[in-house]
Amino acid sequence: MEIKRHFGVYAVCFENGKLLCIEKTRGPYQHRYDLPGGSQRLGEGLTETLTREVMEETGYTVRSYSNPRIYDVFVREELKNFMVHHVMALYDVEMDEDAPQVTISKAVSDGINDSLGYIWMDIQEITEENASPLVLKVKSELLGFPELDKTFYMNWKVNDEKPTSS
């Protein structure tokens, strides 16, 4: 089976039991909660990617970042003959509360924005049905059970619509 690699840089902002997430609109994580972040541009450093992606997807300015770490997951969508090895660099971030929040644009400089906006998700409401593998990794970490080894999702379901809350 073919394995494609994807590398991205993502923000972990956890306050008062809630995780800052974005609502994905396309791709394998569509209609799921995901972390703010994404792919690097040519010549861009990790923290430059981090701050740019957070601004584009949430409108927030990152004040500080710390605790860099890397996780990975293997995702094979239902009925696909390839798997994606998603490698993620994560940083804990604090937002600059004094900076004005920028309006999120549907179109960003590198194409169409793939998020509907941001949401503060209660960590207890995050499930495999409503979240991306990235968010699930972070949830485990925040609950004190970090999954340091690779995780496999062999029949990943791409949601056609947003899951309903129970």
Predicted regions and their residues:
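Generic short beta-strand segments
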Residues: 68-74
